[in-house]
Regions:
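Amphipathic alpha-helical segment in the mid-to-C-terminal domain
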Residues: 21, 46, 75, 114-118
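Generic structural signal for alpha-helix termini and adjacent loop/cap motifs
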Residues: 30, 56-59, 110, 128
Length: 128
């Protein structure tokens, strides 16, 4: 059990331009995905993760704190942005949650907001 004066950050789906090639973002980026799912994910860029850590560390916030972009994005929509909207949909995915969107209200209450939206980044072919 964590001490009462501790904080734990619960990150959603973290990504970056050099994300692992065997994760969905990397598979789509590298045009190696063979399917998509009907899941929705709260994609947070690693730069926003670092920003969240810097914001939260000096505060007195305790307990578990969800950290994400705060937006639920369908995996299929991300595939479309990567030009792979025609991939087959894998329906049966045991052990996967349908949606992992984070309630980022605690982070926003200390002045933090995420700034890198995955759909804008992919659409603009940017590497923040």
């Amino acid at each position: 059990m964590a001490p009462p004066n501790s904080v734990g950050m619960r990150f959603t789906t973290v990504y970056a331009p050099d994300s692992r090639d065997n994760m969905m973002y990397g598979l789509l980026r590298d045009k190696k995905a063979t399917y998509v799912t009907n899941h929705r994910r709260d994609w947070i860029h690693v730069h926003d993760v670092c920003s969240a850590i810097r914001f939260l560390a000096p505060t007195t916030v305790t307990g578990p704190v969800p950290v994400g972009y705060g937006e639920s994005v369908p995996v299929r929509k991300l595939a479309e942005k990567f030009g792979q909207g025609d991939l087959p949909v894998k329906e049966f995915t045991p052990g996967e949650v349908d949606d992992n969107v984070a309630d980022i209200s605690v982070m926003m209450s200390i002045g933090w907001i995420p700034v890198i939206n995955i759909l804008d980044t992919v659409q603009n072919n940017e590497d923040p």
